[in-house]
Amino acid sequence: MAETAYTPRLRTEYDRKIKSALTEKFGYANVMQVPRLDKVVLNMGIGEAVNDRKKAETAAADLSLIAGQKAVVTYSRVAIATFKLRENQPIGCKVTLRKAKMYEFIDRLINVALPRVRDFRGLNPKSFDGRGNYSLGIKEHIIFPEIDFDKAGESWGMDITVCTTATTDDEARALLTAFNFPFRQ
C-alpha cells in the first residue's frame, strides 16, 4: 500500500498561496525564480564552555531538542589569550535544518516561541544581510516548549539565520512576511 508522505503546513501554504502571490508581485518569468526557504541555521555560543566542557554538551542536547535533529559541538580554531581560550576547546554548538524540519521549526518559532518572549514588539526589519538572508537573536532558549523551564539549569541565547534563495532583501522580506514573520512596523 502506498502511504502519503507528510508535508508540513507551511510548505503546503507556500506551494498553494505564497508562490503565486510572489510571482504576481515581482513579475517572475520562470517558476524557479520565485524565492523559497533554503535552510535555517541555529547557533549557540557558550562562553562558559571554556571552563566547563559539560556546558557545551548540555547546550547541544537542548539545541537538539529544539531542532529535532542532532546538534554539533563547535570548537575554537585559534587560541585567544585574553579570553583564556586554547585551540580546539568547545565554544558552542550549531545545527542546520532543511526541508520538512526547517518548515516545522519556523512554524513553531513564529506561532509558539516568539509570542513567549517577554516584551516582544516584533522582529527587526533591518536584520537582512543584503543577499536575502535574515538573522535574529534570542536571549533565552527556554522560550521553546521543548525545553522544560524547571530542568534547564541555565538559559543561553541563540542565533537563528533563515537563508532564502531571494536575491534582494525586498524579495526576502516579502517571502518572510508571507510566512507571517512578525516584523516591526
Swiss-Prot record:
GO function terms (MF aspect): rRNA binding; structural constituent of ribosome; tRNA binding
SUPFAM superfamilies associated with the record: RL5-like
Signal sequence range: none
PROSITE patterns in alphabetical order: RIBOSOMAL_L5
Keywords annotated in UniProt: Ribonucleoprotein, Ribosomal protein, RNA-binding, rRNA-binding, tRNA-binding
GO BP terms in the entry: translation
Pfam family, one: Ribosomal_L5_C
GO terms for cellular component: ribonucleoprotein complex; ribosome
Gene3D superfamilies attached to this UniProt entry: 3.30.1440.10
Function of the molecule: This is one of the proteins that bind and probably mediate the attachment of the 5S RNA into the large ribosomal subunit, where it forms part of the central protuberance. In the 70S ribosome it contacts protein S13 of the 30S subunit (bridge B1b), connecting the 2 subunits; this bridge is implicated in subunit movement. Contacts the P site tRNA; the 5S rRNA and some of its associated proteins might help stabilize positioning of ribosome-bound tRNAs.
Oligomeric form and interacting partners: Part of the 50S ribosomal subunit; part of the 5S rRNA/L5/L18/L25 subcomplex. Contacts the 5S rRNA and the P site tRNA. Forms a bridge to the 30S subunit in the 70S ribosome.
Protein family: Belongs to the universal ribosomal protein uL5 family.
HAMAP family registered for this protein in UniProt: Ribosomal_uL5_B (MF_01333_B)
Protein name in UniProt: Large ribosomal subunit protein uL5
Organism per entry: Bradyrhizobium sp. (strain ORS 278)
